[in-house]
């Protein structure tokens, strides 16, 4: 009786390829950002703002899907950053420029340069924010973002555009305010101001009943006036960073004063 043919040796080379499901969501987010650029060029600014918010939803889902399906990869991390640059860096900058900033050129050459410079500053700060985030993935405290996250900055700018469009206020009328908005949002992205990341938010734990009531009220408000409610939420979140940072600084200074007083006070006599 002859011995059976031995099975072929397994290849030691790693399998090449990418995970499909999470990268499909990342591609969808990039497409939404690209569509926002096209819509803004065509003058459909409400559609452009909505597209950026859709990109934000898809961007928030790809990472969670990758963790749930255990399909995380370095390729996905880098691809997600490139998608974020398009959707939350270039797209909002171009929407702001075509909607409002371009009209500064009618006030002179210098003002026109200020318009595109503000748009570029926003896009550049988004790129720097994403690069810094990638280098601090394994080091930074996951409970907080260092600087305003690019989706939040895009949400602030796009909810403002969306709200003004619903109110029939043209961007040309706000061309002196829009660069201030773009610069503030851009600088907050590269700042060291801490923002709550919601990554440590309890998911499986029970929550107070009042939270359910607040969630229902929020949904009703979003249905009644989506753009205005999103703008209010974005403004409150943007303001929370400086407030939380100043509060933390005040607490640290108070602790330092207390320690200094303890060192200076004489020891009690026996």
Describe the residue ranges of each PLM region:
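Short juxtamembrane and helix-loop transition motifs at transmembrane-helix boundaries
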Residues: 7-17, 41-47, 76, 107-116, ...
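Active-site His/Glu-centered metal-binding helix of metallohydrolases
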Residues: 31, 57, 61, 65, ...
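Topogenic membrane-insertion module of multi-pass membrane proteins
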Residues: 1-60, 244, 268-270
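C-terminal membrane-associated helical module and adjoining short loops/tails
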Residues: 1-10, 142-270
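Helix-coil boundary and interhelical linker segments in multi-pass alpha-helical membrane proteins
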Residues: 35-50, 93-117, 160-177, 223-228
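Hydrophobic, well-structured mid-protein blocks that either form specific transmembrane helices
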Residues: 116-155
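Alpha-helical transmembrane segments of polytopic integral membrane proteins
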Residues: 34-37, 54, 58, 92, ...
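Multi-pass membrane catalytic core of lipid/isoprenoid biosynthesis enzymes
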Residues: 21-26, 68-130, 160
């Amino acid at each position: 009786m002859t011995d059976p043919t031995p099975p072929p040796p397994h290849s030691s080379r790693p399998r090449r390829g990418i995970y499909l499901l999470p990268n499909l969501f990342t591609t969808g987010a990039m497409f939404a950002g690209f569509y926002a650029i096209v819509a803004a060029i065509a003058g459909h600014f409400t559609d452009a703002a909505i597209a950026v918010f859709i990109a934000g939803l898809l961007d928030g889902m790809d990472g969670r899907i990758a963790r749930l399906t255990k399909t995380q990869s370095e390729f996905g991390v880098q691809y997600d950053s490139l998608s974020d640059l398009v959707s939350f860096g270039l797209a909002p900058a171009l929407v702001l420029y075509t909607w409002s900033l371009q009209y500064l050129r009618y006030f002179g050459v210098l003002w026109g340069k200020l318009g595109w410079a503000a748009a570029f500053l926003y896009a550049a700060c988004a790129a720097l924010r994403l690069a810094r985030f990638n280098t601090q993935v394994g080091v930074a405290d996951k409970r907080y973002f260092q600087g305003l996250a690019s989706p939040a900055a895009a949400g602030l700018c796009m909810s403002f555009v969306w709200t003004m469009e619903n109110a029939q206020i043209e961007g040309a009328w706000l061309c002196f305010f829009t660069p201030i908005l773009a610069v503030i949002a851009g600088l907050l992205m590269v700042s060291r101001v801490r923002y709550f990341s919601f990554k440590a938010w309890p998911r499986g734990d029970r929550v107070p009943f009042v939270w359910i009531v607040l969630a229902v009220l929020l949904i009703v408000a979003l249905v009644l006036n989506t753009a205005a409610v999103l703008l209010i939420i974005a403004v409150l979140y943007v303001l929370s960073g400086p407030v939380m940072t100043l509060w933390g600084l005040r607490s640290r200074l108070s602790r330092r004063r207390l320690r200094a007083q303890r060192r200076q006070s004489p020891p009690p006599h026996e």
